């Protein structure tokens, strides 16, 4: 779920680039919808299977592994209002497996928000996907829910895996968020 502080951060960053945005885990879709309205000339890509990962049970009242129907319905309604939203209803793992070099070039993504599967494996997959999408460009990757053990552990591995690409790291956007600026190759 895109918090307003994170949305405002991306709003400022996207003004500075010709590249597009990608969100992993849209929940109700409000953040993606707002970005799409604010940036009608940009493509706003997103992926979400609408399956409860066990970390939002208190908010969703849905058991782990079950479909998040109300979130799905809300997101699809909002996405229908913006022709620049390109939504993929699948897991980020499946999306990454099927991602082609041609799609990476066509998507032209430089900014990625990771708020999907909050497990270590899920967050790890998501940073690999983010780096593939950014490719050789400069970019920004924002992780949400960094206080969750799986996400925090994945971030530590991310930092060890890509030290030459990470040009800065900061935590000032939101207490549960970490921002990484990615340098070009």
Predicted segments, located by residue:
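Conserved SAM-binding loop and adjacent beta-strand
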Residues: 1-6
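S-adenosylmethionine/decaboxylated-SAM
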Residues: 7-185
């Amino acid at each position: 779920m895109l918090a307003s502080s994170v949305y405002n951060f991306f709003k400022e960053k996207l003004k500075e680039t010709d590249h597009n945005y990608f969100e992993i885990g849209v929940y109700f879709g409000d953040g993606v919808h707002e970005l799409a309205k604010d940036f009608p000339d940009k493509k706003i890509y997103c992926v979400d299977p609408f399956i409860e990962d066990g970390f939002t049970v208190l908010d969703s009242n849905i058991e782990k592994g079950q479909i998040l129907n109300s979130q799905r319905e809300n997101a699809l309604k909002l996405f229908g209002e913006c022709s620049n939203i390109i939504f993929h209803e699948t897991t980020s793992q499946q999306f990454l497996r099927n991602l082609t070099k041609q799609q990476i070039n066509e998507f032209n993504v430089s900014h990625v928000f990771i708020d999907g599967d909050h497990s270590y494996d899920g967050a790890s997959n998501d940073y690999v996907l983010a780096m593939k999408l950014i490719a050789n460009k400069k970019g920004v990757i924002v992780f949400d829910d960094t206080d969750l053990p799986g996400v925090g552990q994945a971030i530590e591995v991310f930092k060890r895996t890509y030290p030459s690409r990470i040009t800065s790291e900061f935590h000032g956007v939101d207490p549960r968020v970490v921002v990484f600026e990615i340098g070009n190759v």
